């Protein structure tokens, strides 16, 4: 139906009118009616539908043949119907052709009715015509609607076909573009292959040079070592091959699974193709399904894109968080530095407090002999002790609260210093009273005892310092062990990374093979397209030939000759097809083999290059780690130097303070003798008051002991809290260090290729860093100045408080006017101390400048040393070149001898076996030569340990070269002896020459092939060697710097021990001198001068020692560098031999590994995902634990604050009670005279108790230090474990990223494969359609050959629809096939090969001619 509607044209009515048969025209209307709602023939009067024309004739005769009226009314009705039809034509202009055909059909029906029925009555005819016209109008309207709907459906079908055509065009364009891209890729690959061949040629030349170097004689001892290493390497390679075989088996299983899935998918594709071939109706359904699938695919791609965008956002957030984390870590480091400085300040204050405690002990020894002033001073001392204890607690709180209460702590420390000044003033007053009361001998003895106590204290301090040094040494050893462990772990991780990279490379090779297979498929598709085009051209040629044949047949020329020609052409074409297919198969197979060989070669070269790149990367990472360790060690050394300087300054300040005290004591002795007579009268009054005060003093001492016990408990709690805080801070620092290590590993992975270029820039950056450190130190100096200003402000505040206290203590001012003068002198001393501190700061700046100058000098020395090393390198290379030239001469002689031996070896098989044995002996001798070379290198390294004996070392090398020449001459003699033996064998075995010539030629060819392989491998070896030399030179340079720093540390420790021994000796001398102070005051000045001279000598000696050590370090660096070069040469040779064996085995197992590694990567991916989830859970649990610990610390801090407040309240209450008791006991001062003796005894016992308490405190401090050691050990272990965990996480992340990348690439390849499969399906469908068309053309060809002009008598029915011919149903011949049809089946006209004009044709022939 659709074809008929499409084939209707407005000009067809004219063509139909031109036909000879007038009865053929009504068929169009019949078709329209048949395809409308009614079926068959319709009666024009009653509009009844009938099955055939005979039935319509009978119906009309039986029903409507009532009478014959006049025809005038009918003619009028016809005119009316014509007017109505014209109106309908105007209303329906879009369907003019169909309306004309319907009108013409109605007129023809009327003519036939008039012929067979005659005239009827006019009235009946008029009524019948009116009804007929109305019925016809309704039928026409229905037909119009149907035609519109059919047009709409046809348009939809046309749009679908156009969409399909557009899709096919786009796919063809994509295929062509991919073909062009693959062509370009192939050209690039060919270029790469040419470059690789050039590189191989270069490497062959390099390998030949290396052969000349390797033919040098080694020592005998290194052969065993090399054998052991070879055995180890072979075992490792066996294990690797076993693992790779397992992986290949797994990959084969997966490949089989994939192939089965591929076969299943191909079966489903074939089913879909068969279903598509069933009919065009199902095409639309499949198209819709395809569109739905495409929509779902688009949705999935959008989801994937959204997920990738989310991942990218998360990655960006992660990077931001890492940056924030780095900033916080930097801020924490700055805070830690500031806390460290404040801790140092606190230590200085504690040192001052210890000095004040010693002065308090002296005051307690002298209290028993003082008067009323002593009571008030003791009360003030107790108040100072209580305030000092409060200040200690507050200092610890300040350490916890850090930034909030720093100012308050500084104010309290200022108050403590002022109170200590007052204590010193009171001590001087007590000393005056004590000097008046007692004789000079007692004073001297007591002072000697005090100095002995000071010496003991200093000895204790020295012992503590020695213990601390020992602890630091043990810590350093532990750190070294940890470093070694971490290095081992790092090496293991590098091995794992290398294995993972090898697996990934194998996977990449598999992917390249898959891509290559896809390219082959694309080429096949293109070939099929070319074949399709050729088939279309052949079809067009066949159609032209068919038309020629039709013309010949219609012209009446020989049909048999034409058929024979066609058969011969078909036979010839089939033979050509078979030949061409065989040629194509052969060419395709050869082409595939060539491509596979090229691909294998390219993959081998890529594997070699990637292995070399991995080694370079591993060496660069090791270099960077060593450099970081060097920097850390340098920082530690600088910190130790700073600590040592600070301690030496403290010792010097303590000695200066002692000298000042001695001068003060002498002045006091002189004044005390004069004041004794004046104060004897006052003693009687003071003695009474002392009796009363002793009782109070005992009670208060008991109270102080209780308070000290409480203080100890609080200190222990506070220490435990501090340890927890330090543990948490250490954990945080470790996490920060791990994060920094992760970032460093990322940056190292990204910048490993650019490190060699940036070596020059690194030096400039180091200079800039040094300048920044200087600026930071200047900032520290400015901070110290600000602290001094703050302290001056605190002093002013203290002065204000002093003025208030002076107003309250007017009575004391009258009695202690002398003390005020002493306080003024102390203020002056404080100002002097401030000035001394400023001078010390300037000295520190000068030291910094000196250090900078030393740095510049050391850099210049290093440059000079590097120049000298370069000169020595050039000399050594010249000597090596000379040795190489000698060895080349030897090799040439050996080669000539080998050629002679090969010519003579062709004579006999036995001679060949003897030659093989001799070759093995020569290999052994070559190994011995290598061993001798190594021994020579060892001798060279030993000779270079002393730079002064370089000339002697050169002479030794020349001697060894002479020995080598002698050994070469001995070898020549051996070869000549072998030649003699060979000649004897030739004379005996001339019979077997003909047979063995062929075998020897084959062996020579094999040897040449092996030599080519060796040359290719050695070229790779030389490139790797050059890279390794550069990297290892950097490594050994940094190792030499490390050794120098360690030696400097050792020298510093030795200096410390010497200084300590000097200090101990000086202190012993001071103790001996103190016993004879009165007798040797005159000799004191001379001894001090001697000590000053000794110190100057010590400084000069220390400078000389430093210079000598620097020279030693420079020389040792040079020796280490030369040793490293020799060791590098040996290691490089061993590595290259190992790499040759590895490469030979890797070439065999490369194809198997690629399949195994994909399965391993998938398993590893799943394991890593699981481990990632577990680690995330652990991290969450750790975070929760951290939060709990923080909350517990806050609660503990609040409790400590509450307890402190309670104690302050108790202390205030007790102070009030003490004041009340003092007022009560002032009345009973007279009784104090009797209890003087008792008090003196009690004071001595108290001093002993204080000594025991100090010893206990020292033992507790030792315990604390031991516990701190244990905690440090535990922290180190925790740090190691956390570092391993972090490294594992980093490795897992890297593997996950690689897996994700691999999955993305696999998905891309899968999409490409699906697209290619679709294209294959389309091409196969097109080929099938072409085959069908060819079959249909062959059928039509046979039909055309069998066609005959049918006769009217033989055919009674239509040959298409089967209608019986009658008067109404007439016969019509098809001008194409010659068969007879009815008018309905032969309505169409078309051009045929036998006619120039359009001729009546049946529907089938019309479709054939038009299609």
Swiss-Prot record:
Residues 481-490 have a biased composition (Basic and acidic residues). The keyword Transmembrane helix does not apply. It comes from Mus musculus. A zinc finger (FYVE-type) spans 1352-1410. GO terms for cellular component: axonal spine; cytoplasmic vesicle; cytosol; early endosome; early endosome membrane; endosome; glutamatergic synapse; postsynaptic early endosome. This is Early endosome antigen 1. Disulfide bonds: none annotated. The FYVE-type zinc finger domain mediates interactions with phosphatidylinositol 3-phosphate in membranes of early endosomes and penetrates bilayers. The FYVE domain insertion into PtdIns(3)P-enriched membranes is substantially increased in acidic conditions.
